Amino acid sequence: MAVMLIARFDGDVDQLRRAYDRAHALIMSRGGATGAGELRHHCAVGEGALYIIGVWESEERVRTRWASEEFQDVLTSAGFPSPKTADITILELYAAEPPL
């Protein structure tokens, strides 16, 4: 069953954006996260936080990816906070437009 991940990283938004850009470029240069089960990926910012919002094939796949040492190392090597510091919410996906 598909799920939606919402991960909130608190901090200086300008610094988080720059670190996100570096980390995202590195992840994409390695083939992205579709092989890990990510179907869609979005990044948004708000007052004092950066959000990563993704649609994943299953809760198990997102938890496996976000708990992996390799993923943590990629993020932190680019100056992005460890996924362990994120406030994470995983929700059952009810609907998506356009459909998956």
Model-derived segments and spans:
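Short S/T/G/P-rich N-terminal loop/turn motif that feeds into the first structured element of a domain
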Residues: M1-Y51, V55-E69, P81-L100
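Low-complexity, intrinsically disordered Gly/Pro/Thr-rich segments
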Residues: Q72-A78
